[in-house]
Amino acid sequence: MMNSRMIQKKHNKKKVYDGKNISVNIHNVSFRKKKFKREIVEQKSASAVLAFDGKGNVLLVRQHRFPHGFVFEIPAGTLGKNENPRVCAIREFIEETGYKPKKLKHLINYYPFIGYNTQKIHCYVAQDIEKVSEIKLEYDEFLTLVKMDFKKLLKMIVSGKIVDSKTICAALTYANSKKV
């Protein structure tokens, strides 16, 4: 049961930055008769796909992510305006891999930065994929498609070699559901 005395009340907000991928607002809030400010990053939500090729491998992309360097991650992308997360997942998966999932099941949603960011990640699992096109990248994307044994992916997560949060959440949620 939610207690209304535990909720911070928003009075107003001021936009202090408006960029291509994020905007930053300062919210004036009160809680227990005290006033303070909250810095909130508004960011588009995204969809991601943990996809299996039918041979125990997952499809990952390896790309350079400034400022962190090269990373392995599951295919993903931001939702367009009013875009359904499932539609976004399929679109991004085709663009980044050239494959289309015949079966796509919702896996988990999560907020990667719950205390100060509005972004929500929608994760799906794909089985029974088929090659439908070549990879279609944005002007600022460069990636390599990598097929990796799922158990190797899990070992790389545990060893700290996979550091991408959506990949970690999707893989561990899936592994737990299948008792891998």
Indicate where each model-derived feature is located.
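Acidic, metal-coordinating catalytic segment for phosphate/diphosphate chemistry
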Residues: N12-L50, G54
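A short, amphipathic edge element
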Residues: N3-K14
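Unchanged
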Residues: F36, Q43, S47-A48, G77-S165
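Conserved Nudix-box catalytic region and its N-terminal flanking loop in Nudix hydrolases
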Residues: R5-I7, V41-Q43, S47-R91
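Short loop segments at secondary-structure junctions
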Residues: R32, D53-K55, H64, A126-K131, ...
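A general structural signal for well-ordered alpha-helical segments in protein cores
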Residues: V58, F72, F150, I168-A171
